[in-house]
Amino acid sequence: FSFELALRGANVLGIDISSNLIEIAKKRLPKNLKENAEFITSDMMQNHGSFDYIILMDSLIHYPEKDTVNILENLLKNTNEKILFTLVPSNFILTLKLMVGRLFPKSDRSPTLSPLNTKSFIEIYRDKFEREYNATVSSISKVSDFFYTSEFLELRK
């Protein structure tokens, strides 16, 4: 998304806690986009200024529900328009896959996921986001293939 947004004239700040991923992004950044895009190693919870849009692709999928809400609340304070984010929707098949994954030695496991019931998440926090931040939360789309499932949501001010 970063390159496409910069190509369309947006000023982009890409943040990741992985310095390796940031270095890859910097190397792949076309020279004509260097004025519009910057990539830094940091934590999304640090204050990096005010943004019109914040996009969190798979950034929240490792956090339990309470932490996810706290992160979104913190980011809403510095958001002018909306936050787009993905969550991993809980379902029987995913629960089964995660249980099977726990059978492997710890070093062979994938990162921890925190699936959430996204429909309940929206229903539970809709009033809170509207009341405290004048923001609406809704689902935009679902992405699913055999190994990857997520739901794309937005918090719009």
Q: What feature does the model see in each segment?
A:
Residues F1-G49, N70, N74, L84-K157:
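Class I (Rossmann-like) S-adenosyl-L-methionine-dependent methyltransferase catalytic domain
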Residues D58-S59:
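Short catalytic micro-motifs in class I SAM-dependent methyltransferases
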Residues P64-E65:
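Helix-capping/helix-break motifs at membrane-protein junctions
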Residues L76-N78:
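Short, conserved loop/helix-junction motifs that constitute active-site signature segments
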